[in-house]
Amino acid sequence: MSFDLSRLSLTSSPRLSFLTRTATKKGFVRCSMKSYRLSELSFSQVENLKARPRIDFSSIFTTVNPIIDAVRSKGDTAVKEYTERFDKVQLNKVVEDVSELDIPELDSAVKEAFDVAYDNIYAFHFAQMSTEKSVENMKGVRCKRVSRSIGSVGLYVPGGTAVLPSTALMLAIPAQIAGCKTVVLATPPTKEGSICKEVLYCAKRAGVTHILKAGGAQAIAAMAWGTDSCPKVEKIFGPGNQYVTAAKMILQNSEAMVSIDMPAGPSEVLVIADEHASPVYIAADLLSQAEHGPDSQVVLVVVGDGVNLKAIEEEIAKQCKSLPRGEFASKALSHSFTVFARDMIEAITFSNLYAPEHLIINVKDAEKWEGLIENAGSVFIGPWTPESVGDYASGTNHVLPTYGYARMYSGVSLDSFLKFMTVQSLTEEGLRNLGPYVATMAEIEGLDAHKRAVTLRLKDIEAKQTQTK
């Protein structure tokens, strides 16, 4: 699968302009979403097209490092100070013991939605539990791999421009199934200094043990170093802004001895659509990602010449107009793009190069293309599978690799909360069968102590056999 790179022109492809809302007082203006034909791009141009906007972390690190150092030295006091500075909230208590908190009252429809989501997410992640397998590689040589839960984990649930209780479920449920003993959930407090009731409901349902009422880099630092009230964790999960991401990056390479789930960037979607896809659905799927924030990445891959682009344009303008977060969506679309593919092979080839966080395939007989997909965080197949179902309640996890990292990282799963150990056990016969080969390899590498650890035992086995004769 490859593009026809014989033509290099970028200028002959049509430009698809979407009517989207901007932050100006003029209301709605025409906002262009750049478009390209894949068959007219060179390899280097395709490489440039799939590259995400560069994030300059140098200045962000300059801001975040002092926060991390302050939390390390001052603990809860620093967390309170930064929460007052950034969130305008004075905290009396930084961490709550979830067992001491009552389950909050929720509207019955909201509670039912969370309960259905919980059941589906639990079922999908519970099914990921693997049985222990033992292999006898040669007579008397048995090897196996066993799993153990990570003892303490930190879960970051953003507050920011939107409350995300769904993220509490996505992170806490696999931790609950894995059997993590200490589960700290960090989330910014409300203006009253309390915990968002929807987040608290999900946290209690999914077995969270502590809630850290803080967000940003200070929350990540508190979980990494530990404070008087916040347990130190061994691995930190969850999405966040650039400051949260920077804190995770810094701390995983520090004396804190903490690991993280994956690198993170702005949220993104790539939609592959042909003439059978509804313009209404295409527009809705693009906007559902664009509304996350102005830095969201939105890509539309049009297959063939039968797609009604004008209808998509009209639907985007219509739907964006009624969105409370329409300004975010507008800004995201302004730096996103459309590509035109001659067929599905070309479309999927580009998608695999782009490696999107979310991939929607809305074409005729969409299921038959699943086998060609190599790089994507999560895939949504067919006209009745909007990205929203995976974001909330289908059962798959919505904490996924972004920024092209789907080429080498997986989304959060049950395995993310486990560590694996290998175990081997040899009988006398096993060492007699395997030992000479090990001794030879150790000798080649010049590691005499390794060799001796085997040969001393082999001599004892030989002596024992001689005595019994």
UniProtKB/Swiss-Prot annotation:
Its cofactor is Zn(2+). Gene3D superfamilies: 1.20.5.1300, Nitrogenase molybdenum iron protein domain (3.40.50.1980). InterPro entries: Ald_DH/histidinol_DH, Histidinol_DH_CS, Histidinol_DH_monofunct, Hstdl_DH. Keywords: Amino-acid biosynthesis, Chloroplast, Histidine biosynthesis, Metal-binding, NAD, Oxidoreductase, Plastid, Transit peptide, Zinc. GO terms for biological process: L-histidine biosynthetic process. Substrate binds at S267, Q289, H292, H358, D391, E445, H450. PROSITE patterns: HISOL_DEHYDROGENASE (PS00611). It is found in: Plastid, Chloroplast. CDD domains: Histidinol_dh. Its EC number is 1.1.1.23. Cabbage may contain multiple HDH isozymes encoded by different genes. Belongs to the histidinol dehydrogenase family. This is Histidinol dehydrogenase, chloroplastic. It comes from Brassica oleracea var. capitata (Cabbage).
